[in-house]
Regions:
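Structural marker of alpha-solenoid helical repeat scaffolds
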Residues: 50, 84, 118, 152, ...
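Conserved alpha-helical positions within TPR/SEL1-like repeat arrays
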Residues: 29, 59-66, 90-101, 124-135, ...
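PAPS-dependent sulfotransferases, especially Golgi type II membrane carbohydrate sulfotransferases
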Residues: 266, 278-289, 299-368, 415-446, ...
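Phosphate-binding active sites in nucleotide-utilizing proteins
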Residues: 361-464, 474
Length: 607
């Protein structure tokens, strides 16, 4: 005779068909919570002997084990409870929490989903599922579950905050800002949310409000180095040098191991580190427990500090080490750049010019000016000059074109046709998307500059969207450009080619050849300006620049250093100074130490 499959037993199918006494269970939990853990566990084990088929007791037992950091035992207890009652949502949830602590993210996700499938209106399960999805970088999926968490619990401040972080991770600044605002509305003393609200304001160029929220965060919790560091960066963008230095010093004071504070202080040429600061930097550098991010930052900081002191050997040693570590961290290969440039050629080589004449006849309410070239070529300086004109607003670096290009080449734009991704219909959508990226700007100006250097890759896209666009291309001695790039520790994953001299030479070659391609494809439409000519003949070159942009003469453009706008680039300090010459010669001091770079760039020197 076949044995019948046993029916799962729920919490009512136990001793004498009764549930364990709830009052007794709560009493045991209270005992455990008071710190009398051993007594509570003894009482619970005795109760389990009386009610061996009660999943509720196994759930409590698993929770006790988890609290005692007996994670593997807790997993066993939760799984036993689920064998008795597979539809016990809370146990699936607790199992997910424990698996997450064990680092078993995929298994944790499965458990959270099981809990939600049984009990959809379960805000904590949606919240923790969102957190797990963030770990594996599935941000859009995470956002859906954070949104459900706040639907089912509208007062869930932490869920709003993490929803903001997820939106921030995909550069959805508008939504992230709203989420942080909601978290703060529920919990006004939420220091982390105030800090990240400041970050969002900074991301969109509203530096004054960024400072306000950093200060609010510090008023709530004055012991967070990261927030002082953020405040210092924002103050630097507004040329509040003394305030900026103090904020970075405060960051290092709160946490002497906060490497980024020393790196940012090293960016001020007039700043001299004291003995305690030097000792702290060297301690970080020698530490066995320092993480890669901080080790890279401290190498660049020590390099700058020694450069300012004239210690050439130490400067170069720390600089080379910082670059070596950064290249290793990014796992960059020049082959990836070869592929991306090849994709550009394939996309635009056969495209007629102009390929969509109808767009030329559409009047724009906002007129874009693009300032581009290699990083460290002078794009910030030129934007500072042009944005000093009364009719122009300098938007800084707006990276929307890179995103748009990625979308059209991956065929994910709406309404696209298989072989016509740059159809008029799609180009209108792209144009709208470009202007949407400026929606946050508080400006009455109709002429807006975008000085993202990397936009040199997307000149074909720019002229497709804006056939009458003004494009200013910065040219500079390639030795000055590449040496300056090599000395910089760029944030995020931008400019990944920067940390190796051979990579720099090869990338410069790719850039140079692509610019030749664009000039041939769009003859007479790209305005080349030489950085050295601009610094030598400021007024003459400025007049030519404004003439190309179809702007009347404005004396303010000669006094660009008086422009009070926020400058969110590594050149924020330089553009506050009057025009100076000689910066393109800085590499000569180290020529014998960077010979591979110098030799590799010889084919691209002006003759």
């Amino acid at each position: 005779m076949k044995s019948q499959k046993k029916r799962p037993i729920n919490s009512k199918n136990i001793k004498n068909n009764q549930e364990p006494p709830r009052e007794l269970i709560q009493s045991i939990i209270n005992t455990f919570s008071k710190g009398q853990k051993k007594e509570a566990i003894i009482e619970l084990d005795a109760l389990i002997k009386d009610y061996p088929l009660a999943p509720l007791l196994l759930n409590v037992s698993g929770s006790f084990c988890k609290s005692n950091n007996q994670l593997d035992v807790a997993v066993t207890k939760f799984k036993k409870a689920l064998n008795l009652d597979p539809n016990y949502a809370e146990v699936h949830y607790n199992l997910g929490i424990t698996l997450r602590e064990l680092g078993l993210i995929e298994e944790a996700i499965k458990s959270y989903k099981n809990a939600i499938s049984i009990k959809n209106e379960y805000p904590n399960a949606h919240y923790n599922l969102g957190n797990a999805l963030v770990i594996i970088k599935k941000y859009n999926d995470a956002i859906k579950h954070f949104e459900l968490a706040v639907v089912f619990n509208p007062k869930f401040a932490q869920a709003y905050y993490n929803l903001g972080l997820a939106n921030k991770s995909i550069e959805n600044n508008f939504e992230a800002g709203l989420n942080f605002d909601k978290a703060l509305a529920i919990k006004p003393d939420y220091a982390e949310a105030a800090n990240d609200r400041g970050v969002i304001f900074q991301n969109v160029g509203d530096i004054e409000n960024a400072i306000k929220y950093y200060q609010k965060s510090l008023a709530i919790n004055p012991n967070v180095a990261k927030v002082y560091n953020n405040l210092g960066i924002a103050e630097k963008y507004l040329n509040k040098i003394d305030d900026s230095i103090k904020s970075f010093e405060d960051a290092a004071s709160v946490d002497p191991n906060f490497a980024r504070a020393y790196y940012n202080l090293s960016g001020f040429k007039q700043y001299t580190f004291n003995k305690d600061q030097v000792a702290a930097m060297q301690s970080i550098h020698m530490s066995d427990s320092v993480n890669q991010f901080d080790l890279i930052a401290i190498n660049f900081a020590l390099a700058r500090a020694n450069e300012h002191l004239g210690n050439q050997d130490k400067f170069l040693s720390y600089l080379h080490e910082g670059n070596r570590l950064r290249k290793k961290e990014l796992n960059y290969s020049i082959d990836s750049s070869y592929k991306s440039f090849l994709n550009i050629y394939e996309t635009f080589s056969l495209l007629p010019n102009p390929h969509n004449k109808s767009l030329q006849n559409i009047t724009l309410t906002k007129r874009p000016i693009f300032i581009l070239g290699m990083p460290r070529s002078g794009t910030s300086l030129v934007e500072q000059i042009i944005s000093s004109h009364e009719e122009v607003f300098g938007a800084g670096e707006i990276n929307i074109l890179k995103k748009i290009y990625s979308q059209i080449t991956r065929n994910i734009l709406p309404n696209e046709k298989e072989k016509n991704i740059l159809s008029e219909e799609n180009l209108m959508l792209i144009r709208e998307k470009y202007f949407d990226s400026f929606a946050h700007l508080s400006t009455y100006h109709n002429i807006i500059t975008n000085k993202t250097p990397e936009n040199f890759k997307y000149i074909g896209l720019i002229f497709s969207i804006f056939p009458n666009a003004k494009i200013i291309h910065l040219k500079r001695d390639p030795r000055a450009i590449c040496w300056s790039i090599y000395k910089s520790n760029w944030g995020g994953k931008g400019y990944r080619f920067s940390y190796n001299m051979d990579d720099l030479v090869k990338y410069y070659s790719l850039y140079s050849k692509l610019m030749d391609f664009w000039h041939k494809k769009f003859p007479g439409k790209i305005y080349d300006i030489c950085y050295e000519d601009l610094t030598t003949n400021q007024e003459k070159e400025t007049k030519k620049l404004l003439e190309y942009c179809e702007l009347d003469w404005d004396e303010n453009c000669l006094n660009f250093h008086n422009n009070k706008r926020a400058v969110k680039t590594s050149s924020s300090l330089q553009v506050r100074q009057k025009m100076y010459q000689g910066s393109s010669e800085a590499w000569k001091k180290y020529e014998s130490h960077i010979q591979p770079l110098i030799d590799g760039l010889k084919p691209y020197l002006k003759t």
